[in-house]
Amino acid sequence: MVINGIAYKALVRFSVIDSTDLVKTATKKHNLSPITSVALGRLLTGIALMVPWLSKNDTLTYIIEGSNKIKYIAAQSKNNGNVRGYILPKIVDTITNEKGKFDLKSAIGNGTLKVVRDLGLKTPYVTPIKLISGEIAEDLTYYFTISEQIPSAIALGVLVDKNGIKRAGGIIIQILDQSLPKKDITEIEKKFKEITPITNFLEKHTPIDALKHIFGKKIEKTETHEINFRCSCSHQKALESLKLLKVDELKEIIIKNEIVEVSCKWCSTTYKIKPEEVKKILEEKNK
């Protein structure tokens, strides 16, 4: 569940989430290694924080393209709270930094962050920026500050232990108007640092506690939004994908008389297509 709202006479907006269940679901569906769980988990958490600020027909996608072991991460959210994502490759050997923590910067390497906003019009808006960190939260912060010119503070975290995902969560704070006094900004920055790492804070506190710690009585309004890892794939869409094959390829499948498996990249669900279904597709192509 995401909690969002406004503070400081609507000069500041915020969104916070305990995304543990979301990240656990993604990790299980894709059968990820620890460091890929952390990478995808952070991006999923970051995109989930944006759900309250999406319009009805909006689809928001974050894409990270890396140059090292982690090549590609994608996360997508819609206004209805449905979030999905995937990472390539799914299994990567753990890389740690001098503090013994997951080193996403090294695992991802140099690369780009693309923010894709599909407003339901003909062409989505795509904004690419270079990764400045690879730790994801810092890269999203840089994007909002530079590309959207909204001063932002973002914390994202995924805590892993021997049993898997222990805790995941995130928070974003955005200053919507430059008339907010400097002393208030300084106070927000100070309080924000006190609740990070966000996963450590959420181990003993709730997302509401994080908001109260930062804003106190300055909070003016809060709302809640359900968040679920839910894909829009279906058996019918799997059939549609086979229609892209050439006639000769479809004939070859029919000759083998085997069930065809089509996997969704977003959620790793596998759909089994029967030979007679492939025959129907071929018949339609030959009409």
UniProtKB/Swiss-Prot annotation:
The keyword Disulfide bond applies. GO terms for molecular function: protein folding chaperone; unfolded protein binding. Disulfide bonds join 231-233, 264-267. GO terms for cellular component: cytoplasm. It is found in: Cytoplasm. Keywords: Chaperone, Cytoplasm, Disulfide bond, Redox-active center, Zinc. Under oxidizing conditions two disulfide bonds are formed involving the reactive cysteines. Under reducing conditions zinc is bound to the reactive cysteines and the protein is inactive. One of its GO terms (biological process) is protein refolding. InterPro entries: Heat_shock_Hsp33, Heat_shock_Hsp33_C, Heat_shock_Hsp33_N. Its main location: cytoplasm. Belongs to the HSP33 family. Redox regulated molecular chaperone. Protects both thermally unfolding and oxidatively damaged proteins from irreversible aggregation. Plays an important role in the bacterial defense system toward oxidative stress. This is 33 kDa chaperonin. It comes from Thermosipho melanesiensis (strain DSM 12029 / CIP 104789 / BI429). The gene is hslO.
